[in-house]
Regions:
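Conserved short alpha-helical segments that host acidic/polar catalytic motifs at enzyme active sites
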Residues: 1-264
Length: 264
């Protein structure tokens, strides 16, 4: 992850993040992904970004903005779509995000939602980190902070949806190095609490657990503290939010974490 103190560096966020991603290629050659948080000039509390993924983008993304507007009763001018390879960012009024998500299930059932929020965009695909970064032109992106991940699959299949980051809450995401041993029991409990899952990946369970805790009123720090008691296994998490990110390791701390701070 990378958080910029120096606002003049925000236009370079994508370049810096892509370089970090490529450097980690040997660690995770199966798939790669990033979450990038838009700079202050791009973020508006009156609009929501919904990042989408499709295995057939030339079909699913055609006329999608107009179809969303029609199905939700919005004016066409309130909806816009920016396509980037297999992903697209749908911009809608913030108060309509939930309606749009429900609409997408009906009008584009094969489209998957990567993230929702005012600032976050998530891009992830199967392939070497350099290839993924080039497909989405990551080096051209700007932002305040970002998180990347290169994957070597251990808990689930090598798929786009199994790649990291995972997002289970507004402007939230999580990447993970390690393996959870109680993710199936936690998944069942969270499902009973109304949480929906897209994959059988253990990392999605960790992300959903933290989101659920925060929706119940916990701060990010409090949610991470609870996770030390409730999440079994070995792990290092980087958790992104609208304002920054947090890092936590399991009590045994067998997975490394390297952190550094500069004036920039």
């Amino acid at each position: 992850g990378l958080f910029l103190k120096d606002q003049s560096l925000q236009p370079q966020m994508g370049t810096l993040l892509a370089e970090m991603l490529v450097t980690m290629s040997d660690r995770g050659p199966d798939s790669a992904g990033i979450a990038i948080y838009g700079d202050d000039g791009e973020v508006s509390s009156s609009a929501a970004k919904i990042t989408l993924q499709s295995s057939a983008p030339h079909e699913d993304f055609v006329d999608l903005a107009a179809d969303v507007a029609a199905s939700t009763g919005m004016d066409d001018s309130k909806v816009s779509l920016t396509v980037k390879d297999t992903h697209a960012v749908l911009m809608v009024p913030a108060g309509m995000a939930a309606d749009v998500r429900a609409s997408l299930d009906e009008i584009r059932p094969t489209v998957r939602i990567m993230s929702v929020g005012e600032a976050i965009e998530i891009y992830k695909e199967v392939g070497l980190p350099r290839s993924v970064a080039e497909r989405f032109s990551v080096s051209r992106m700007s932002g305040t902070h970002g998180i990347g991940h290169t994957r070597m699959a251990t808990e689930s299949a090598v798929t786009t949806m199994g790649a990291h980051p995972f997002s289970t809450g507004a402007d939230q995401c999580l990447v993970h190095n390690g393996s959870l041993s109680n993710h199936n029991s936690l998944r069942r409990k969270l499902i009973r609490d109304g949480v929906h899952f897209e994959t059988d990946n253990d990392t999605e369970v960790a992300a959903a657990y933290l989101t659920h805790k925060m929706q119940q009123g916990a701060s990010l720090g409090e949610a991470l503290e609870s996770g030390l008691d409730d999440l079994d296994g070995f792990y290092t998490f980087v958790v992104g939010t609208r304002d920054g990110f947090g890092v936590v390791r399991d009590p045994i701390a067998c997975k490394p974490a390297v952190m550094a701070e500069t004036d920039q």
